[in-house]
Amino acid sequence: MYKRQKLGLDLKAIDMFEINEAFASQAFAVRRDLGLDPEKVNIYGGGISIGHPIGATGVILAVKVLYELQRTDKKDAMVSMCIGGGQGISMYFTKD
């Protein structure tokens, strides 16, 4: 079972997604396969737009999300991060 299911998260209800990608087709495929609203995905560009710096992309995308949550009325966001060798992890952020 996916952790989001354990947490009761509905992907359609999440306000923003930052999907890390080394290739543009990855972000497109994830958005398509999960049925995500394109207006909510990588709204300021994903990992490619910042040069996909190894070891830094995840934290850069997380900080982008945190600033966007602070700056707007969005209530939550999800960030995916690569951790090398084809592995991945995601973080869910919410504000009170």
PLM regions and their residue ranges:
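Claisen-condensing/thiolase-fold acyl-transfer catalytic domains that form or cleave C-C bonds
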Residues: K3-D96
